[in-house]
């Protein structure tokens, strides 16, 4: 029996247990071993994480696909798991140690600290997994993986070794994003750009061979910089080769202020003649652009900052090389200073000696570590790199050939732009938590890369015996006795970038490098659902690794969803205080309501503006359907054995079969096309409007009337249509549908394992064939594609006429503010015989639902009547004596004027180029939406006014 009140929390906990106990989501179920597989890998959330709205959207869409395909009989594997999240996890544990006043990481030592991290993971690392289960994620949780599981770690080591052997992993000295607080290189994704109100310092660099005179511009060249603290590492000044004012200086030298070093003036396109002074200082060791300029001109790289962001000069051989002896005292003065203190000290000295030309206020973007919030330094250091350019070629070819497609397609352009300009991928991190790089160093620094330490020792002993460093006898002894080789080779202390192991996720989770049955069955995967922000960091790298090691792209479709913003369109952030916690919404309105909201708003390519009111609205939708099911139960509506809905004789019942099949087609096609919003809209319209508002209302007189064949058929059809709704709604609202499925009849299987409406599948197959021949299939009416025995044009024409007539009359009553108690007459003008017969058959229903006094027929519409066009025929509402036409005309005129004012106000804003250029994108979009709403409002009032004119 259905409970009187819909209580989401009770249902959700109960249904979660039911699914888990039944193993409902396990891949490879016995009855599906011969079925076509369908695979999705979850974007593994950080083990430190908790559910945010992006997770909620991402996993809702994945779950819709998985439940849909599972009901279509496929062997679904939704592979779950979490990412070890190197920096984030290490920071969490270090913070915990600090809060508990325990020894820090370095005091503990690596081994003990890693034990502590694993302990933290065991105690606290499952939070987000449990939250995903609350959302209803139908993953095969028995296969949950962690990026540092033993099997995945073995895959990481094998990939590293094979890429190194192929020359695709190497060590190099390059600039990296360096976090001076965390003391590690970080990826671009871990860098946030912060707008800072700073200064632009214009510095005078004396031209070699001329006596420097601050008052004589011919004796110096002015360069502008936001980072005077790095100027001691300058190795050139660049001007554009076509800079008419400065090109004559190319080839000459300047004297670096304070240091006295002679550095060249080079010609390079990087210098913008229209920007600043037209001359730029080149510091290859402290700027990414300067690094490339330095490589083009073979400039030395002088790093003047250490790992902690302090000036390092006194013992810096690169800095001291070629430095005049008189500059050493200044070097000692700045040595060891924090970079920002050094900035002030250096500027003061520059001003003292006349090298400071001017200071201008300057607002610019400064990179910060997203976790430490420290200003990130471009830092020159030895790191491990992947030759991403080589791996990118086949990854681009896979998308160009159609092996992998992006949805929406415009994201392919973004993918190609990044891949075509891809840089070497820095994969080493100066952390302890993560996959330690499988490289060992011999006594002379020789590198040995191997999957295990034993293999590395074997390579090292063989090499040093061959080189004569040790004898064969010594080598054999060291091989036999671990004590003799202790400390002979030392492992690289760095760990791999978290994205390195994540790049292997589609196949490492299946047991690779072993040839497991899972690898053979579930790779490649079908769909990847992810956000646009990690196309480069994750999607592209999975493509590279998957194609290189598996010889196939890891997925056939990449669906890119948009951002979830607040109701005003602003990006959610803690600083703004506008973050919406999905779990709060789940607690208040239920997981089903949140899921349906996110799916209904997931328009391809458009960010979601989320408000709690929308979630509340869909909770009300769930409640309405719940109450409809209670009505069916209370009136003994059940599906008899061997019930055939296509054998119905009652027009109303034939109509609901037609509408159900039509909706099944729409929902199926929309989900297959990743148009989640269209699928949700179709099922919402059907449940709320067709089933609840029309079918049940029209069926009530029969159901509540005397026993008859019509009553029996109608009760059966009410239950049958309810069951079809449960199936179609299940991917979006799994909890309420599974509960109602269980309590409304004796079932042989869970709803989540029940067959999707089959006739919709048959329609889909036919539609696929048509689409192959007609690229404009999207414009074809969905009713043209219904299977013949699920299509009933006569029933649709009859009930559709009743629905259209009642809807139009209700609309006029609302527009004219006619009170519900006031009954109006209806005249069908020039009605066909069929329309006359329909009006008579449905007279009581039409009068009751439209609040009519009577229905009559005439050759023409009477004077003073509002005319409605219903399927090509005129229905007239004589309103004389019912409506004050003059007052309504005045009211509608005011509404139109108000809408015009709103449109004009928005148009004025949108015509302002300053507003368009400076306002945040979400504000501009909000204004455009306001205009659309005002225009729609105006159109409605204009239409009402036109109708009113006919009543005069």
Curated annotation (Swiss-Prot):
Span(s) of short sequence motif 'HIGH' region:
45-55
Tell me one Pfam family matched here.
Val_tRNA-synt_C
Q: Which GO terms describe its cellular component?
A: cytosol
Q: Which Gene3D superfamilies match?
A: HUPs, Isoleucyl-tRNA Synthetase, Domain 1, Valyl-tRNA synthetase, C-terminal domain, Valyl/Leucyl/Isoleucyl-tRNA synthetase, editing domain
Q: Which reaction does it catalyse?
A: tRNA(Val) + L-valine + ATP = L-valyl-tRNA(Val) + AMP + diphosphate
According to its UniProt record, where is this protein located?
Cytoplasm
Q: Does the keyword Cytoplasm apply?
A: yes
UniProt-listed GO biological process terms: valyl-tRNA aminoacylation
Subunit-structure text: Monomer.
- Family to which the UniProt record says this protein belongs: Belongs to the class-I aminoacyl-tRNA synthetase family. ValS type 1 subfamily.
User: Any idea what job this protein has?
Assistant: Catalyzes the attachment of valine to tRNA(Val). As ValRS can inadvertently accommodate and process structurally similar amino acids such as threonine, to avoid such errors, it has a 'posttransfer' editing activity that hydrolyzes mischarged Thr-tRNA(Val) in a tRNA-dependent manner.
The protein's name is: Valine--tRNA ligase
Source organism? Nitrobacter winogradskyi (strain ATCC 25391 / DSM 10237 / CIP 104748 / NCIMB 11846 / Nb-255)
Q: Taxonomically, what lineage is the organism?
A: Bacteria, Pseudomonadati, Pseudomonadota, Alphaproteobacteria, Hyphomicrobiales
Which gene is the coding source of this polypeptide chain? valS
């Amino acid at each position: 029996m259905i409970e009187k009140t819909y209580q989401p929390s009770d249902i959700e906990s109960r249904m979660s247990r039911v699914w888990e106990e039944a193993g409902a989501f396990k891949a490879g179920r016995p009855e599906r071993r011969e079925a076509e597989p369908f695979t999705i890998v979850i974007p593994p959330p950080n083990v430190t994480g908790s559910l945010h709205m992006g997770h909620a959207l991402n996993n809702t869409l994945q779950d819709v696909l998985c439940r849909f395909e599972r009901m279509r009989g496929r062997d679904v594997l939704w592979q779950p798991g979490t990412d070890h999240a190197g920096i984030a996890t290490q920071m969490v544990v270090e913070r915990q140690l600090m809060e508990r006043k325990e020894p820090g990481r370095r005091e503990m030592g690596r081994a003990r600290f890693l034990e502590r991290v694993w302990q933290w993971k065991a105690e606290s690392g499952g939070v987000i997994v449990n939250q995903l289960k609350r959302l209803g994620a139908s993953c095969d949780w028995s296969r949950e993986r962690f990026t540092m599981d033993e099997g995945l770690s073995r895959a990481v080591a094998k990939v590293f070794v094979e890429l190194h052997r192929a020359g695709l992993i190497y060590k190099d000295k390059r600039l990296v994003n360096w976090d001076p607080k965390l003391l590690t290189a970080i990826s671009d994704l871990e860098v946030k750009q912060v707008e800072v109100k700073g200064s632009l310092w214009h510095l005078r660099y004396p031209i070699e061979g001329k006596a420097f005179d601050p008052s004589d511009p011919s004796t110096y060249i002015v360069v502008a910089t936001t980072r005077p603290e790095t100027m001691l590492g300058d190795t050139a000044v660049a001007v554009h080769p076509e800079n008419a004012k400065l090109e004559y200086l190319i080839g000459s030298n300047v004297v670096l202020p304070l240091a006295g070093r002679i550095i060249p003036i080079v010609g390079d396109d990087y210098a913008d003649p229209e920007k600043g002074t037209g001359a730029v200082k080149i510091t290859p060791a402290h700027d990414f652009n300067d690094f490339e300029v330095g490589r083009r001109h073979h400039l030395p790289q002088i790093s003047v900052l250490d790992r902690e962001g302090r000036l390092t000069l006194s013992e810096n051989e690169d800095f001291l090389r070629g430095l005049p002896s008189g500059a050493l005292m200044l070097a000692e003065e700045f040595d060891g200073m924090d970079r920002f203190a050094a900035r002030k000290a250096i500027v003061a000295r520059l001003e003292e000696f006349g090298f400071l030309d001017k200071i201008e206020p300057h607002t610019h973007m400064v990179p910060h570590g997203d976790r430490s919030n420290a200003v990130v330094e471009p830092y020159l250091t030895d790191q491990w790199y992947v030759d991403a350019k080589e791996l990118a070629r086949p990854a681009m070819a896979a998308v160009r050939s159609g092996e992998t497609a992006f949805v929406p397609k415009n994201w392919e352009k973004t993918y190609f732009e990044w891949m075509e300009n891809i840089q070497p991928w820095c994969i080493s991190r100066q952390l302890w938590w993560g996959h330690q790089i499988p490289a060992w160093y011999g006594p002379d620094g020789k590198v040995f890369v191997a999957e295990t330490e034993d293999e590395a020792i074997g390579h090292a002993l063989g090499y040093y015996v061959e080189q004569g460093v040790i004898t064969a006898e010594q080598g054999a002894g060291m091989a036999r006795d671990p004590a003799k080789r202790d400390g002979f080779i030392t492992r690289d202390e760095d760990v791999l970038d978290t994205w390195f192991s994540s790049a292997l996720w589609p196949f490492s989770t299946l047991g690779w490098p072993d040839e497991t049955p899972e690898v053979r069955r579930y790779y490649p995967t079908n769909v990847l659902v992810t956000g646009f922000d990690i196309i480069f960091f994750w999607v592209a790298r999975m493509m590279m690794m998957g194609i290189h090691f598996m010889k196939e792209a890891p997925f056939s479709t990449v669906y890119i969803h948009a951002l979830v913003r607040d109701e005003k369109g602003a990006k959610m952030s803690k600083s703004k205080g506008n973050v919406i916690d999905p779990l709060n919404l789940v607690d208040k309105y239920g997981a089903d309501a949140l899921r349906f909201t996110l799916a209904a708003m997931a328009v391809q390519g458009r960010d979601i503006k989320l408000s709690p009111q929308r979630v509340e609205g869909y909770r009300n939708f769930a409640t309405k359907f719940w109450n409809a099911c209670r009505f069916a139960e209370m009136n003994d509506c059940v599906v008899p054995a061997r019930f055939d809905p296509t054998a119905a004789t009652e027009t109303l019942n034939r109509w609901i079969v037609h509408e159900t099949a039509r909706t099944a087609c729409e929902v199926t096609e929309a989900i297959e096309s990743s148009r989640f919003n269209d699928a949700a809209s179709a099922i919402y319209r059907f449940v709320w409007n067709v089933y609840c508002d029309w079918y049940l209302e029209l069926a009530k007189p029969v159901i509540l009337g005397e026993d008859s064949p019509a009553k029996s058929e109608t009760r059966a059809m009410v239950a049958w249509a309810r069951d079809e709704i449960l199936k179609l709604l299940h991917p979006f609202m799994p909890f309420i549908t599974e509960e109602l499925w269980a309590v409304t009849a004796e079932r042989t299987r869970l709803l989540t394992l029940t067959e999707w409406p089959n006739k919709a599948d048959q329609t889909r197959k036919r539609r696929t064939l048509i689409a192959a021949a007609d690229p404009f299939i999207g414009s074809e009416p969905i009713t043209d594609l219904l299977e013949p025995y699920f299509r009933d044009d006569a029933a649709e024409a009859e009930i559709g006429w009743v629905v259209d007539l009642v809807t139009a009359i209700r609309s006029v009553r609302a527009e004219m503010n006619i009170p519900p108690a006031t009954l109006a007459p209806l005249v069908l003008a020039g009605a066909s015989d069929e329309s006359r017969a329909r009006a008579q058959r449905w007279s009581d229903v039409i009068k009751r639902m439209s609040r009519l006094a009577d229905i009559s027929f005439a050759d023409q519409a009477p004077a003073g009547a509002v005319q409605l066009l219903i399927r090509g025929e005129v229905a007239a509402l004589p309103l004389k004596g019912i409506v004050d036409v003059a007052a309504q005309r005045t009211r509608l005129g005011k509404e139109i004027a108000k809408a015009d004012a709103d449109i004009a106000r928005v148009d004025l804003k949108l015509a302002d180029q300053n507003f368009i250029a400076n306002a945040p994108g979400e504000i501009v979009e909000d204004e455009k939406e306001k205009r659309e709403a005002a225009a729609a409002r105006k159109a409605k009032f204009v239409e009402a006014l036109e109708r009113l004119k006919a009543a005069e």
